[in-house]
Amino acid sequence: MHIVKANSMKAAVFYGAKDFRVEDIEKPEIQPTDVMVKVKACGICGSDLHAYKEGIFSRPGFVMGHEMAGEVVEVGSRVKHILVGDRVVPLGGVKEKGCGECFWCQRAQPQWCSSVSHKPCGECPQCQSDKFWLCEKNQRYMTAGYSRNGGYAEYMFVPDAGLNKNVYKIPDSVSFEEATFLEPLWGAYKWVEMAEPQSHDTAVVTGLGTIGLLVMQVLRERVSRIIVSDVSEKRLQLARELRAEVVINAAEEDPLAKVTELTGNGRSFSGRGGGCADIVIECSGAPAAFKQAIEMTRTGGHVVLVGLYEHEISFDVNRIIHKQLKLVSSFNPGRRPPAAEIVDCMDLIASDKVKVKPLISHEFPLDEIMPAFETQTKAGESVKVIVKP
């Protein structure tokens, strides 16, 4: 018989590549400025998948999961405007602003603030190995699901909780499962901004996982034409249902040739041709897609790299120089998001202007965390897998 200890909770603890174990761990205690959230749903992110497959981004003993939604069950004495029973999305673990004086704050990057209350210590073995997100000494204020326990558990705490700062209420019309898309949707919003889209642009999105499908929907109101590509017919069909204008099955035809056919042959300084897409947002993390993205884009166009690559890529960098491409990337969209942007993203979900429910392909209970991750690895069968503690 399974005996549950007092003040404990069930959690999926990460022990390394392809090794989660559902265990009873100590339930966190909140401080006067914190709130406790009972996790109702947590989405599997692409970075979680890399941790599962390769053992990176986390370390043994942590509880992963950062795309979560739940119900407030405990509120610290100094917290205002958040009540027990509120349905919420907790966002991230970095404070709203840095010290304002350090190297990073002076460069408008407070997410890397050197103040000890905001940034890793720089001294522990993890920091010395440049794995600052795993800092052993400053877990309280680090990102949930990376360096402090996250959403693959029954409960999680939110430090220094503030409404529309790191806690956002869920409208009645939005389910917990749909609300887990708030963080990735904001990421999609920022990645589209990086591309500086114009109303007359043609944009290409390569890779139609959750992020690619969200990027596609955010782009819809900002450009004149969207072309998408993937190797999964399931995901391509979903893109069609979400009103993608042009869909390319990269397993059956050459995406570069098709984009060139649709956009025209644009020559660069080197004299070589290629596509004339104004924007390419590469979300797949496939080496072939990276190379195609460079060739699909017109001279002077924008390439945004979103997908994570498992291996080094051999590539002629002169192609980027000759085409005068604006190449940008981001592992994390940046500093604490302005509250207005997050509220806007929640409104996009609530209004169904960005459709997230069709992206949920599977749901699993916490006890089945391993089958959940195995399912998420199968791109031909899944889109977004939700874990429900």
Regions found by a protein language model. Give the residues of each.
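Glycine-rich beta-strand-centered segment in the early N-terminal region that forms part
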Residues: 28-42, 55-128, 169-173
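C-terminal substrate-binding/catalytic core of Rossmann-like NAD(P)-dependent dehydrogenases/reductases
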Residues: 257-268, 274, 311-362, 370-371
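C-terminal hydrophobic helical "lid"/dimerization subdomain
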Residues: 2-7, 268, 291-295, 339-389
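Short N-terminal strand-loop motif that marks the start
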Residues: 1-74, 84, 154-158, 162-168, ...
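Mid-domain Rossmann-like dinucleotide-binding core that forms the NAD(H)/NADP(H) cofactor-binding site
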Residues: 154, 169-253, 257
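Glycine-centered, small-residue-biased loops immediately flanking beta-strands
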Residues: 301-302, 325
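NAD(P)H dinucleotide-binding glycine-rich loop of Rossmann-like/cofactor-binding domains
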Residues: 96-206
